[in-house]
Amino acid sequence: MICICDYRTPADVLHTLKNEFEVIQLPLDAALPAPVWGHSDLMIFRLDEYLITRYKYYSIASREINLICKKAGLKLILSDSAVGLKYPNDCGFCAAVSGKNIICRRSSTDREILRLACETGYKVLNVPQGYTKCSCAILADGAIITADRGIASVTLKNGIDTLLISEGHIDLPGYSYGFIGGATIHFHIIKLAAINSSLPAIFFYFNLFI
């Protein structure tokens, strides 16, 4: 399995990740705000067998993105969308996938994501929060944790099991508080403890207090 992470990820966290994953660190995107310019969920988006990124970012990170596509067997889609230093112009790729749903702020979401959602039969759930993926810890198909009430209201109405927690307790320099989605990764452990199925697992980045 591969793990895609910030180029600034601390050495001790990388050491832990490398016990389970092949780690690929993405280079920074200076078109994004400095506190988040290494955050992969603002630079790339995966849906099924497709990976979407911007032309301009691909010119910076082609080696890493090509490696991701090769290792994961993904087809690359390049978007000509622009990105900006201020919200909501920085969150075009920050959509969350849960089951056959794409949770996002539709007006801020990259048009290639919306096009692909339509072509592949995904339902787009429109929420007020542009940093949707940052705001959601994806537990499994159809289950999330979030501190965002606007997201929780929409996901609950659409049959997604949602745990609403209090905001805060996660640090993100430059912002009032961090987001649970940005502090976690979601993956599957295959055939763990002789159980013949895929089990959801969560890796928490440093300590999480709810």
Over which residues does each language-model region extend?
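Histidine/cysteine-enriched polar flanking segments
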Residues: 1-210
